[in-house]
């Protein structure tokens, strides 16, 4: 274990034997740091926070602070961060609320760039990238492999489906379908995240099926519900298309982000 002499570690904190804590960092009494965690200088980890193995946290990040919620009265709530995340300078991640889920959950293998923020009760998947200054309001749910551009923001309770792309400066006030690409303020659906799908090695047949389903789903004929039912019938055997259908059919707190002509 490598602890800089200027670091402050609460005696009750649970640190794996190979954890590194850099200069002027602070680790609170209800914190657990798994194997291989590295806190660089001036990092604050407080609250009931667990950081998974191999995470690297850069200077001036604050993890496990209380939720920015007027109803919070100091109840014990948690922040759980999965393994192998890179958390850059000035990132903030807050614990949950007692009136919500009570826990904020971060998946594995993510990149959280400078100044990005994850608010209370969020659920973030694996391999997620939040670019510089990206912000998640409370209770936001993000699927795996989402890329959120610089200074983009997601409204509280919104859902962002797997493999979707959020353009820089976008204001996401509605749910984003899996594999979608959204831009603008307020954000609107521009199409599918074809670049991301190709980079992740999706087969051509799957991409073609997603494109066909998207064209039908957002066509001009019939009602949206009728078109959605047609997509579900035609592509019943395609897992990725049905993921979009199921996402849309799931009861949600926010409306669906649509192409501009559908808004």
From Swiss-Prot:
Source organism (scientific name): Caulobacter vibrioides (strain NA1000 / CB15N)
Gene: lpxA
Matches recorded under PANTHER family: ACYL-[ACYL-CARRIER-PROTEIN]--UDP-N-ACETYLGLUCOSAMINE O-ACYLTRANSFERASE, ACYL-[ACYL-CARRIER-PROTEIN]--UDP-N-ACETYLGLUCOSAMINE O-ACYLTRANSFERASE, MITOCHONDRIAL-RELATED
SUPFAM superfamilies attached to this UniProt entry: Trimeric LpxA-like enzymes (SSF51161)
Gene Ontology BP annotations: lipid A biosynthetic process
The protein's assembly and partners: Homotrimer.
The EC number(s) this enzyme carries: 2.3.1.129
Family annotation (HAMAP family): LpxA
Name of this chain's protein: Acyl-[acyl-carrier-protein]--UDP-N-acetylglucosamine O-acyltransferase
Pathway(s) annotated for this protein in UniProt: Glycolipid biosynthesis; lipid IV(A) biosynthesis; lipid IV(A) from (3R)-3-hydroxytetradecanoyl-[acyl-carrier-protein] and UDP-N-acetyl-alpha-D-glucosamine: step 1/6
EC class of the enzyme, as a word: transferase
Taxonomy, superkingdom: Bacteria
CDD domains (alphabetical): LbH_UDP-GlcNAc_AT
Gene3D superfamilies: Hexapeptide repeat proteins, Udp N-acetylglucosamine O-acyltransferase, C-terminal domain
Keyword annotations of the record: Acyltransferase, Cytoplasm, Lipid A biosynthesis, Lipid biosynthesis, Lipid metabolism, Repeat, Transferase
UniProt key word Protein biosynthesis: no
Catalysed reaction, written as an equation: a (3R)-hydroxyacyl-[ACP] + UDP-N-acetyl-alpha-D-glucosamine = a UDP-3-O-[(3R)-3-hydroxyacyl]-N-acetyl-alpha-D-glucosamine + holo-[ACP]
UniProt-recorded Gene Ontology molecular function terms: acyl-[acyl-carrier-protein]-UDP-N-acetylglucosamine O-acyltransferase activity
Cellular component GO terms held in the UniProt record: cytoplasm; membrane
Cysteine pairings via disulfide bonds: none
